[in-house]
Structure formats: structure tokens, C-alpha cells
Amino acid sequence: MMENFVVSARKYRPSNFKSVVGQGHITTTLKNAIKNNHLAQAFLFCGPRGVGKTTCARILAKTINCEKLTADFEACNQCDSCKAFNNNASFNVHELDAASNNSVDDIRNLVDQVRYAPQQGQYKVYIIDEVHMLSNQAFNAFLKTLEEPPKYAIFILATTEKHKIIPTILSRCQIFDFNRIQINDIADHLKYIAREEKIEAEEEALRLIATKADGALRDALSIFDLIVTYSAGNKLTYQETISNLHILDYDYYFKVVDALLAENISNVLLIFNEILKKGFDGHNFIIGLSEHFRDLMVCKDPATIGLIEVSDAAKERYLDQSQQCSISFLLSALNLCNQCDIQYKASKNQRLHVELALMKMAKLPQAISLAALAQQESKKKV
């Protein structure tokens, strides 16, 4: 019989504040609230998808009902309350998905439940996910209970769209804004999971997944699971990752810039042709090339080098290539990429449109040299 597979996002869901990734400002505030007994009656957790809102709500619910808090105010995971919570058998935590239970009757049922004190533990916690989906009537039915709930009731509302929540609800809650998670934090967490799962993972591959996830850890874990499955389960390489995610290998951008600096139009066009044959879109290529030029520009100054989030090996390549490019070349190339990007969709022959931009870029070093020479000549005459 096949063993049930548990996705990484569930298997490695944090069980205490310490293991939450990239939300230190939130976890510190919540732990201090527990430590100083300054718990509000209602919290609003808002931020992008997959950054830990529901996870933090569950950890807070478990921690405030824990019978034997640790020295640093974390749940013990040993007492009856923690065990019941970990087994999804706690009567003190109620979760409501407002996306599917958004009517005024659903909220009235919730308000009726609030009247009953907890049988065991100190607090009854009500977690309402996707709270922005509640109807206006449901919000209004909820107002009085949210403002003056019984002392044992705590509400935690979670949303990705704070602007859709009516001001009267916002004013009754302590608002916590969750950040997008940094690429480094996601990559480190993926490295930890790969180690736990005994998977050989290349750092470049993990960084690529972290970048693709756009600050959402849950998305990163889903991509990680997908690529591990694709690669037969014990190895995760950069090449398999770019193949699976259909991302253009950044090595192509280095080759294109080398050819541009050498003013080799034929080579540039051949590389672009190879990229198109692999099924990549010309528009995405020009956007990627402009990002590459931006990264080279950033590498020109040691003060800004931290602005590019790549592995150390890739950073060395960017540094080497940036030394071969003048600021004038990079600015002019960025300008050409930008014009090509803006005009791409209006073009009747999009391939030629990109090729023309690349040919102009290939002649930039010569144009810059001639301009510098002309400037020197004019100075001599003066």
C-alpha cells in the first residue's frame, strides 16, 4: 500500500514562533504581548499570500492556551492542550473560512458560539481566514461582539486584501502587516528542508525557486515539491529547475552581452535564434536582458552590490562582466531595452523588432568610442 505523501508546506508548517520564517517583527510583538499579558481581543493579520498569516494565528492560539509555557514564551507541545491542538482535536480553536461562510447567518452562528466559555484552557480563539470575503451585513453583525467580546474570547482575522475591510472593523483590531519573505530566507529554509529530506540540492536551484516564488514561502515549497518529483526524488539541479519552470538560463544573458561588447552582430542573432527555438518568448527575453543590464550596473559600485540577490558564484560572474562594460554602454543598452519592451506589443514583426534593438546595442561600443574621440578633438581645438 502506498504511503500518503504530505506536501512540504504542511509537513514543515512551523509549530512555534521561533520556526516562523521571515516575520521576526510579528513573532517578537506577539511573544511580548503574551509575556506582558497585553493580548488584544482582536487581531488582524494582513499581507500577501503564503507568508505565514494563518500559521501565526494557529501558533498564537496554541501558545496562549499552553499550560506549561517555555522560558522564552513558546508553546511546550507536551501539555494536554498542545497535544489536542497538534492533533486537530482542540475545542478551544475554531477556524472559519470566510470565503465559503460569508453570510450574515454564518457570523450569527459564530456569535452564538462565543457565549460559551472554554471547557478546558484559558481562551477560545476564533480564526477567520479570508475575512475580506464577508458581506457588509456579516461585518455589521460582527461589530459588537468584536468590540466587546467575553474575556475568554480572542478573534484573529486574516486577509490578503486589507482595503476591502470596512473601517469600523479595522478600528477594533490590532493590525499586523506581514512582509513578503526575502529570497535569502526562502533559500535557507529550502536548504533546511532538502537536508531533512536527504535531497542533494544545488544552491543555484534553490535560489531560482526562491526568486520565482515572489516572496511567498508556500509557493516556493510547492515548486520545490514539483521539481523534486520531476527529478526522481533525491537530487535537485539548476538545469532541471530551469527546464521545469521554463525559465531562460541566465548564462544566455552573459553570452549575449559578451557578443554585444565584441560588436559581433552575427553571434548575437544566432544566440537569440537559439533562445526562440527553445520556445522562449522574445518579450520575456528583452525584459530578462534589461534586468541583466540593471544587475551589471548595480555591480559597478561596491556600495550597491548587495542589491543583487544571487549566489556568490553568480555574483563573481556579474562583477567580472560589469568591469568590461562602461556606464555609458549600460545606460544606452538599458534605454534601448526599455524602448523595445514598450513598443513590443504594437510591433507587426516582433522578432525583427528585438533583433533591431540587439543590432543597435552591438554598435553601442563603437558609437561611444567615436563620441569620446570627437569630444577629445573638440577640446584640442579649444
Range-by-range predicted roles:
Residues 1-175, 193:
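P-loop/Walker A NTP-binding region and its immediately flanking N-terminal helices
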Residues 87-91, 106-109, 122, 158, ...:
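Extended, largely alpha-helical regulatory/partner-binding modules appended to the mid-to-C-terminal parts
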